[in-house]
Amino acid sequence: MADEMIVKELDQVVVRFSGDSGDGMQLAGNIFSNISATVGNDISTFPDYPADIRAPQGSLTGVSGFQVHIGAGKVFTPGDKCDVLVAMNAAALKTQYKFAKSTACIIIDTDCFQKSDLDKAAFKTENPIEEMGIKQDVIAAPISQMVKNCLADSGMDNKSMLKCRNMFALGLVCWLFNRDLTIAENFLREKFAKKPAIAEANIKVIHAGYDYGHNTHASVDHTYKVETKTKVPGKYMDISANKATAYGLIAAAEKAGLPLFLGSYPITPATDILHELSKHKSLGVTTVQCEDEISGCATAIGASFAGALAATSTSGPGVCLKSEAMNLAVITELPLVVVDVQRGGPSTGLPTKSEQTDLLQALFGRNGESPMPVIAAASPTHCFDAAYAACKMALEHMTPVVLLTDGFVANGSGAWRLPDLESYPAINPPYVTPEMKDNYTPYKRNPETGVRYWALPGQEGYMHILGGLEKDSNTGAISTDPENHNLMCRLRAEKVAKIPVPDVKVQGCADDADLLIVGFGGTYGHLYSAMEEMNKAGKKVALAHFVHLNPLPENTAEVLKKYKKVVVAEQNLGQFAGYLRMKVDGFVPYQFNEVKGQPFVVSELVDAFTEILNK
């Protein structure tokens, strides 16, 4: 053991916590992320857990992981491989070691590497370190036993004490990165406010883990420190995408001066939006947990008709079920925000994994001519702005809007600067005015935008009926006239097509790139990182990442036709590439497609894009 520890200063580091589904790896990772964001580091996280409610203990399929990338400056992805791997049992080491760098430090709980544990993890010998050929530094500590020793006088039973193992590992990682434990203490006291004894037990164990590292130097000769660089002044917090989405909905309702209503049915990975909004009744938020997906959407449409900012949240299977109700919002031309947190499909598919396979469903997955704006969030923190933009678009253009996120984005988190709501654009719904009373009809439109005016129930002189049957363009009465139906289909389509959206920005070597990377939604960080890496290596690469998918930005064709080689990278089998080919004459891109349920790997992107450049 060295007398003094060397502190290595790093610009960035990746830590991966892994263990059984019940080992609390998500909580440990979240707390460490929260500490890092609070002290001023940028972060990007990736929770990775099985779909089982509780997989068999110690099994290879039941391993839960949480990876966080911490940077002194901006970070865009959770990282391809980790600098520190926490493996709380044999199965975690077996399945997660592939994510460790050759220079990584590995922390294991030796108490969970007994023969029965090794057998479950399919090890052939009693020395997994040797069997796997692990050459990295290994901190092998009897964590379970030390936790029981620490809490011996707590009065807790053995099972309850072992639930604190994750906090020992967290304390050890905090020591390794010279983190102050105060933030973790406050987090735990808030989380277990109704169970203070549990909070104090966990806090005691965190300190035990920290002290173990400090007093023994834990088999390593150095610790780390990730510096913080100057950021835009303000208050920062670690925020998940689902929470950011919820906050964006609340902010838009506040800006528009409307109550917020969410009708929803619980579904992975979107349920946290419902949970978060249910906490904010004091802000004028009403949430209804409905009996099914259709009801969730239908109640939201009713709330919209009554004058609320209405939303519904779901995932791909739920969008299938909501499609008829979403079409009701299309034909009645009522504002509605549909949040689709995409997951692996088809059918039940991969509930806890991520894909971008709902794009064409969002664009076209309804009967009839059913135009609907579609926005895709690029990152966890961007979800706030994307949700706000979706609400503004829905309210000002009297249309349902689909907001696409995905499992990777929704479950991940980032360091978020609390915004100044005053700086956000006003939201001005097209309400009827007093002078319209004498000649009001439900589908009276603004001649420039094609948007119908919004008359709320209870306004004298504006009584009207809406419904799912086609309406006369003048009177609002039910109509089956062929010419009228043709007109109404075109009016609804033109209204959406006229919605102004920002131009798509080209990053990197925008003027003279030899390759343009095109993507949308939650792949932004990985595509940007691949572009940066290639440009640092002397290549000329640019990135055009789309947020607005319908309508597309006005400069889309100009951007796509400017470069000799264009590759569309997406987590599906080519939906966005096909859509762009449909919209842009003569556009024939290269494609990079994966549907693994996992985020892109930056090194794999670089290899694939380099191969395209060399053709």
Residue ranges and their predicted role:
Residues 1-256:
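Active-site cofactor/cluster-binding pocket
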Residues 12-100, 268-364, 373-395, 536:
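Thiamine diphosphate
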Residues 12, 51-52, 149-151, 218-234, ...:
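Gly-rich Lys/Arg/Thr-decorated short loops/hinges at beta-loop-alpha junctions or inter-strand turns
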